[in-house]
């Protein structure tokens, strides 16, 4: 399976490097390159910000509100992500994404626009959170050694799940690469291999593990873990519906034989 993932990564890199069409010129070329750079830069910074700030229990964030203002500001930051994220994945949200950007390529750039917005949402959440400075002591000393390892493993699983799902979609590259290649975006086949052969939603499951295995537990992190953890559990219900519409009977068959987020079938068979 490692060879398959390596091939996917190399194919993804090749796709970005060889997708240029001579027919794409002028402002369209500039838009494609600008969206691509913006997308991957904000995505990378957002991921680093998530890993770093949750590692320290949100105590290194740069928000400076206190008291009631901190509660209101932090509440807005934590709620905006699941609400806007879910809306943009809905039918109405997709229509809005189709209008965000230059008129002639906005629809093709929709997946890239979505990734840029999601990355900015995460950046705002993790960079501008106002720390409460309420830190909880670990009940057992050994947790201080185990949790960082589990946290690291969770992020590795998330990276693997992202590769298995298809880097072109998950990274937002599908949109700008399609514009650069002068073709309509073509979504990859339904992922069924790797972690997707065990559960239907390994990305959500991996991120759930990340938010509950943070090495530093604070009042702030508790709130973040509760809200984002709940989102990871319930958001895949809506994703099941979207995938059912996109893939039809193929997804129904896959859904009937593959567990939601816990590999119960695999556990029973071992």
Regions found by a protein language model. Give the residues of each.
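Short, Lys/Arg-rich, polar N-terminal cytosolic tail immediately upstream
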Residues: 1-28
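Hydrophobic alpha-helical transmembrane segments of multi-pass integral membrane proteins
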Residues: 39-50, 75-83, 112-126, 151-155
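Hydrophobic transmembrane alpha-helices
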Residues: 42-52, 64, 68, 76-78, ...
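Membrane-interface helix termini and inter-helical loops of multi-pass transporters
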Residues: 55-65, 96-100, 129-141
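Alpha-helical transmembrane segments
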Residues: 66-80, 143-160
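Membrane-helix interface/capping segments
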Residues: 84-103
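Transmembrane alpha-helix/helix-exit interface in multi-pass inner-membrane proteins
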Residues: 152-174
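Juxtamembrane inter-helical linkers in multi-pass membrane proteins
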Residues: 173-186
């Amino acid at each position: 399976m490692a060879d398959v993932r390596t091939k996917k990564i190399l194919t993804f890199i090749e796709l970005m490097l060889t997708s240029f069409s001579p027919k794409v010129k002028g402002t369209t070329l500039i838009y494609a390159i600008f969206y691509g750079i913006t997308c991957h830069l904000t995505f990378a910074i957002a991921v680093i910000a998530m890993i770093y700030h949750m590692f320290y229990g949100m105590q290194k964030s740069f928000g400076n509100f206190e008291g009631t203002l901190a509660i209101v500001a932090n509440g807005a930051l934590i709620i905006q992500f699941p609400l806007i994220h879910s809306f943009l994945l809905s039918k109405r949200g997709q229509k809005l994404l189709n209008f965000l950007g230059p008129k002639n390529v906005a629809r093709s750039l929709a997946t890239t626009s979505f990734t840029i917005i999601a990355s900015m949402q995460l950046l705002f959440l993790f960079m501008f959170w106002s720390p409460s400075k309420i830190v909880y002591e670990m009940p057992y000393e050994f947790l201080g050694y185990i949790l960082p390892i589990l946290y690291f493993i969770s992020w590795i699983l998330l990276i693997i799940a992202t590769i298995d799902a298809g880097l072109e979609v998950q990274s937002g590259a599908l949109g700008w690469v399609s514009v650069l290649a002068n073709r309509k975006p073509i979504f990859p086949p339904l992922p069924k291999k790797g972690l997707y052969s065990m559960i239907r939603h390994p990305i959500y499951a991996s991120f759930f593990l990340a938010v509950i295995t943070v090495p530093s537990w604070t009042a702030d992190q508790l709130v973040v873990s509760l809200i984002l953890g709940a989102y990871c559990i319930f958001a895949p219900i809506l994703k099941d519906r979207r995938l059912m519409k996109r893939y039809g009977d193929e997804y129904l068959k896959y859904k009937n034989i593959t567990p939601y987020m816990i590999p119960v079938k695999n556990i029973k068979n071992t």
